[in-house]
């Protein structure tokens, strides 16, 4: 049995798609277990860029199956749009498998997300307004519509009718918005269910059987640890558990199944939306990093907030996700810089701390304590091994690993799959 999980070590957008695509070429199965179409990932294949939000990155390379687990919330329109695009580009999509227990993002969930965010005014949290939060709310309230419900016409109609009664009360009486009509939703979504049927199975059984048979299974995390609903910068977080524990519940398997948990990070830090960000750069250095790395959201197109590497946040991610291997991306961005800074601790009310505070008020008062390292002039995008990198780049990598307390397993020096330096094969235990 070989089970490797890839989780975001920062606030998402760390480049998980690239490393999962790289690792999936040796996997029989690639599994996604949380989030929805709020979690974009970009894959470069032979110079062609694919931007996806729902389909697992492993669709390109995993030999047996690319799996959407029960913890994922699915927007059928988005999913079929991605499938159509893949098929037009010659990608085989027949190996997609969808959990019969996954929840469906309904039109009223998208509307509720939009109305709630609008009503918050200045207190908005920066949601993508894709209906992710309300769908997880429906799930927790036990009124959610699952994939298996879409396949049963009578069940689907009954649940939809009841849910619309509840949602329309909210829309008309609280938000002053128009009610939604059953006939505008039912036929379209039932048809989605029929189109989805050929992909649907009990993915918990599928994945656990593969592990029992000694197959290599890759688990793709979505978003990042600092967006986890319990361990992140609450309330500026997503609606699901993005840590490694969420992978287990989001596919239906025991925690003892995971052998390796790889934490993916950038050589700096980014964040989209509102919320505390201790190392944020609001100067020309931040602009330079953003422009060099094209730091704009895959889903929203919004400019990402940019900051120096934060080892305090990554140590927090290591602890709560059990990270035992580090995958660092976008090292090439710092070619031509004079210096690089790493946050080693915070200063809170005159005291040095090395933990990540739960209190937002404390976080906003935290000042980063920096260590400065020299950068390098050389173009490193053709580097194939660690020794090909300039001495200063190697020193930076060693210091990151030392501060986080986790060995590096891969280093990315460019966007293409092959621009990856492997220090340790994650599939080898």
Curated annotation (Swiss-Prot):
This is Adenylosuccinate synthetase. InterPro entries: Adenylosuccin_syn_GTP-bd, Adenylosuccin_syn_Lys_AS, Adenylosuccinate_synth_dom1, Adenylosuccinate_synth_dom2, Adenylosuccinate_synth_dom3, Adenylosuccinate_synthetase, P-loop_NTPase. Substrate binds at residues 298-304. SMART domains: Adenylsucc_synt. The lineage of its organism: Bacteria, Bacillati, Bacillota, Bacilli, Lactobacillales. The gene is purA. Its main location: cytoplasm. GO terms for cellular component: cytoplasm. One of its GO terms (molecular function) is magnesium ion binding.
